[in-house]
C-alpha cells in the first residue's frame, strides 16, 4: 500500500523574496512585464521541483499568486470590479484591483483598490471580492490552466488548487443594500463547472477545492448551500474538499453528504477531530490528514505522528493521504538559508522546504519502510530533548508564572482614584494632544541601522546617532506645542521585532520571510524558550528624551498579546503561558520606566482582536487570558502613572467588554476614516475611562485641515465627554515624511487649542 503525499500550497515569494523585488521593479517601471513573468515562472518551476525531489505524490499548481490567491480567483471568474474592468483582464488589471492607482509603467489609471482584510486568523491578508446583484461570472483569467499545463509539460503529477465557490462568496462583501450575495451562487456555479471541465480536459485527476469556511460556525443558509453547490459542479475530476485552521465539528454531518471524493482536515490546529472524522468518513472517500503544521516553523514529531496515524492507515489503507495542515505560504521558505543559527536551534525548526520533506518521509514510514521509520525516530529526537532542556524551560520563569494570582492583574487603585492622582501629577489641559508613538523613519535612520548591523558603525556611534534623531523629534514636538511627547522610536525597526531582539527566549532569522499581502513580507521572530527580560529595554531612550523637555514624555511598549500574535509561538506550551511570560517581562519594564521618571506609559495592543479564535464559543476563554496578560503588564504602575493603550480596528462592538476590562487609563483608537462612527460602541457601552479617537488618517498623504479636525473633535465630544477626550492621530507616523507630519500635527494642535478655549 502506498500513501499519497501532498501539500496544500507552497510559498510564492521565493527564498530571498525574488517575487517581491520583481513586483516592485515592475511597479516602478524598471522592468518589462515579460521579465516579471519570467521571475514567476522560475519560482513555480523551483517550487514544483522541490515537491517532486522530496518524493511527494503530487505537485500542487494554482497556489502561485501575483498578489493574492483570492484576487487571482476573482480574475479567474471574470469578476473584476467595474471601476477596474477594461476588456479582458491582464496582469495590470490584477495589480490595479489590489493596489488602486498604480505608478507609471503599469498602464494603470486611477481607481480605488479593493478592500483588504485578514485571511481567517492568520497574518496573511486577502483582497476582498465585491458583489452586487447584477454580477455575472465567466472563466476569464487563464493563469490556473497555463500553470497546470506548464507543470504537466515538466512531467509532474499535478493537483490544481482552487478556492471553493462558497468560501469565495462568504469572504466577499455586498456593495449594494438589500442584497444577499448568496443569491449569486447559481451563476457562480456555472463558472466553476466550466473550470472543472477545462481541468478535466487537461488530464487532471484530482483537484483540491479549498472551503476553509467549513471550519467556522456557519449560519444555516451557508451550510445548506454546500449540498446544492457540489451537486451542480460534480464532474469527471475527483474533488478533495479541503478545510483548515480549525475543526469541522460543526459542519461534518453536512460534509459527509456531499458528492465529493475526499476530505482534508487540519490535525495541527484541531488534532481532537481525527476520531470523529474517521468514524463518519463515507465509504471510498480519501482522508487527507494535515499533520505537518503549515503555520509554524517547528520540526514535526514524525515518530509521534506515525504512531497516531498508523491505526487510521490500517483502517483506510491507500485512502489515507498525508499532507501539510494548510498551505505552506504561512511558513518561511528554507531553513538552509540560516547558517547563523546554532546547530541545536536549527534542529528544532522546519521551514516550508523541510516540511515538504517531512510529509514525504511520514508517508514512506506509514507504508512500512523500515529505513523511513528509523529516520522519523532520529528526526524527532531533538524535539524530545528540547522538552527537558533547562535553557528552554527555565525554572525561575516557571516559578514566577506559578505565582501569578488575581491580585497581580489589578492596579492598586480604581480608575476614578487614579484619574485624580494623574490630573494632579501630569497637569494636562482639556483635550490634551499627543501622537501614537513613532515618527518618520527617514532614509538616514535606515542607513545608520543597516551600517550598525553590518558592523560598519560602532555601538557608541549608532547610539549617538539615535540620540540625535530623538533630540530632533523632541524639538519638533515642542515647536508644535504638543502636550504629551514621544521619543519617536528611531531605534526600532519594527514594533515587535525590537522587543523580540531584546528579550531572552526569542530567535530572529535572516531570511525567515512570509508574505503579508502583495509584495509586503514580514519576518516574525520565533519564541524558542521561556521569555524573560534580562535588562531594561526602552528606559535609556525614554529617559534621554525626557531629559530634553519639561513636558511629559510617554514611554512606548508593545503589548504581550500583540508580540505573541505577530511572532511564531512555541508549540509545546499554551499561547496563554507565552502571553503571561511576556506580560511579566513588560511588567518589569513598566516598573523601571516609572522609577526613572516616566509618568505616562503606552502599551500597544493592536492584535488583541486579531487573536480571536475562529469559533465564537472559544472567544470568551481567549479574551479572558488576553485581557489578564495586558493587566499583568500594566498593574505594576502606580496610581499616578497613566497607562495608555492603542488599538486600530474597524469593529469594537463584539469586544467592547474586554476593551473596558483592560482598565487602561487612556485608549487611543483609529476613527478618522469612519468619521467617528466607531465611537458609538464606546458611547453605547458608557466607556468609563479616557479615550483618544484618531483625527488624522496617517495612511493617507493628505493633510487634514484645522476645520476638518475641529469637526471630528466636536463629533467625538457628542459621544464622549470632552473632559475624557484626547486629540491624536489614528496611528503611528513611521511611514509618513516630516513635512506631512508637521503640517498635519500643526492643524491638530490648533484645532484642539481653539476648542479648548471655547469649552473652558
From Swiss-Prot:
The residues that the entry says bind L-homocysteine are 436-438, 489, 604
What this protein needs as a cofactor is: Zn(2+)
Q: Which SUPFAM superfamilies match?
A: UROD/MetE-like
Q: Which reaction does it catalyse?
A: 5-methyltetrahydropteroyltri-L-glutamate + L-homocysteine = tetrahydropteroyltri-L-glutamate + L-methionine
* Annotated residues for binding of L-methionine: 436-438, 489, 604
Pathway it acts in? Amino-acid biosynthesis; L-methionine biosynthesis via de novo pathway; L-methionine from L-homocysteine (MetE route): step 1/1
Catalytic residues as annotated in Swiss-Prot or TrEMBL: 699 (proton donor)
Q: How is the cofactor bound?
A: Binds 1 zinc ion per subunit.
Give the enzyme's main class according to its UniProt record, as a single word: transferase
Xref: InterPro entries: Cbl-indep_Met_Synth_N (IPR013215), Cobalamin-indep_Met_synthase (IPR006276), Met_Synth_C/arc (IPR002629), UROD/MetE-like_sf (IPR038071)
Q: What is its EC number?
A: 2.1.1.14
What CDD domains does the database record attribute to this sequence?
Answer: CIMS_C_terminal_like, CIMS_N_terminal_like
Name the GO terms of the biological process aspect.
methionine biosynthetic process; methylation
Record's keyword terms, sorted: Amino-acid biosynthesis, Metal-binding, Methionine biosynthesis, Methyltransferase, Repeat, Transferase, Zinc
Q: Write down the superkingdom of origin.
A: Bacteria
This protein's name: 5-methyltetrahydropteroyltriglutamate--homocysteine methyltransferase
Instruction: Tell me the organism.
Output: Vibrio harveyi (Beneckea harveyi)
What are the leading ranks of the lineage? Answer: Bacteria, Pseudomonadati, Pseudomonadota, Gammaproteobacteria, Vibrionales
